[in-house]
């Protein structure tokens, strides 16, 4: 199946041309494309939000300028105070965490020492049990030998 297409362009607004394309044998509908016009077709397109922000330079002696500067100075002051407060809060939190860490390390040392003492007691008790079982076993063996001879 061969594809045959034709293009024709119509001049648009603001230096933008619309290209219309007709496609044969495909059955698909083509969407017009917007492309910049050729040389001499106008300047850059400016977004509406940018157009409204253009203003003449302000006079430094005007009330509006002074009010804007005052608001800006207050905002900067507020931002710096907020930043200082955040730094102080962070430093305070760091100190709290250091203290907590020291307490936890001391607790670990104490619990490790307690574990060591309990292990020693357990091993000593286990040794004593083993010695008692062995001595009872030896006595029974000796007593059995004496009873067998009688």
From Swiss-Prot:
Biased segments, Low complexity type: 28-37
Region (Leucine-zipper): 97-118
Primary localization: nucleus
GO annotation (BP), single: B cell differentiation
Pfam families documented for this protein: bZIP_2
Highest taxon above the source species: Eukaryota
One Gene Ontology CC term in the entry: chromatin
Intracellular or extracellular location(s): Nucleus
Domain bZIP: 62-125
Residue numbers spanned by region Basic motif: 66-93
Glycyl lysine isopeptide (Lys-Gly) (interchain with G-Cter in SUMO2) crosslink location in chain: 3
The keyword Nucleus is annotated on this UniProt entry: yes
GO molecular function, one term: sequence-specific double-stranded DNA binding
Function: Transcription factor that binds to the promoter and the enhancer regions of target genes. Binds to the enhancer element PRE-I (positive regulatory element-I) of the IL-4 gene. Binds to the promoter and the enhancer of the immunoglobulin heavy chain. Binds to GPE1, a cis-acting element in the G-CSF gene promoter.
Family per record: Belongs to the bZIP family. C/EBP subfamily.
Annotated PANTHER family: CCAAT/ENHANCER BINDING PROTEIN (PTHR23334), CCAAT_ENHANCER-BINDING PROTEIN GAMMA (PTHR23334:SF69)
Self-association and partners: Binds DNA as a dimer and can form stable heterodimers with CEBPA and CEBPB. Interacts with ZNF638; this interaction increases transcriptional activation.
Protein name: CCAAT/enhancer-binding protein gamma
Source species of the chain: Homo sapiens
UniProt gene name: CEBPG
């Amino acid at each position: 199946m061969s594809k045959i297409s034709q293009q024709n362009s119509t001049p648009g607004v603001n230096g933008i041309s619309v290209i219309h394309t007709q496609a044969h044998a495909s059955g698909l509908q083509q969407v017009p494309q917007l492309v910049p016009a050729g040389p001499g077709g106008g300047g850059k397109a400016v977004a509406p939000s940018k157009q409204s922000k253009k203003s003449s330079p302000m006079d430094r002696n005007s009330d509006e300028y002074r009010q804007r500067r005052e608001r800006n100075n207050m905002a900067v002051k507020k931002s710096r105070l907020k930043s200082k407060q955040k730094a102080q809060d962070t430093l305070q939190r760091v100190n709290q965490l250091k203290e907590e860490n020291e307490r936890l390390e001391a607790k670990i040392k104490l619990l490790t020492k307690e574990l060591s003492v309990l292990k020693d007691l357990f091993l000593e008790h286990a040794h004593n049990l083993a010695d008692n079982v062995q001595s009872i076993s030896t006595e029974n063996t000796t007593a059995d030998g004496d009873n067998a001879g009688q």
